[in-house]
Amino acid sequence: MVEVEHWNTLRLRIYIGENDKWEGRPLYKVIVEKLREMGIAGATVYRGIYGFGKKSRVHSSDVIRLSTDLPIIVEVVDRGHNIEKVVNVIKPMIKDGMITVEPTIVLWVGTQEEIKKFEEDAIAERQ
């Protein structure tokens, strides 16, 4: 049986368009670089194949209907205080999109040594 502990971890999702830019560069790349600079645990970028946003315009990767602005999701899981810092830095970059944050439970991350350090940090954080 897996023992689940609350480590105050959050999942941050940033929903943007593939064509969104920041200072002329793809926004999703700028965000990931900024996350890395900030020492965030990790980030993954997902490219949507079909979807629509608040304007109800459908974006599709179908060959027949090739969209040039597919949905992009940047996902991050880290401790709450790190996610809060990220939101404060990233939010001004988002001109059209959505940011969500939700609690998440991390069951496994990395090597045994990394897990031990993660657990020790979580315990110290509570004190």
Curated annotation (Swiss-Prot):
Disulfide bonds, which pairs? Answer: none
Q: Which InterPro entries match?
A: N-reg_PII-like_a/b (IPR011322), N-reg_PII/ATP_PRibTrfase_C (IPR015867), UPF0166 (IPR003793)
User: Secretion signal: which residues?
Assistant: none
**Family assignment from sequence similarity:** Belongs to the UPF0166 family.
Q: Which PANTHER family match?
A: UPF0166 PROTEIN TM_0021
Name the UniProt record assigns to this protein: UPF0166 protein PH1503
Question: What does UniProt list as this organism's lineage?
Answer: Archaea, Methanobacteriati, Methanobacteriota, Thermococci, Thermococcales
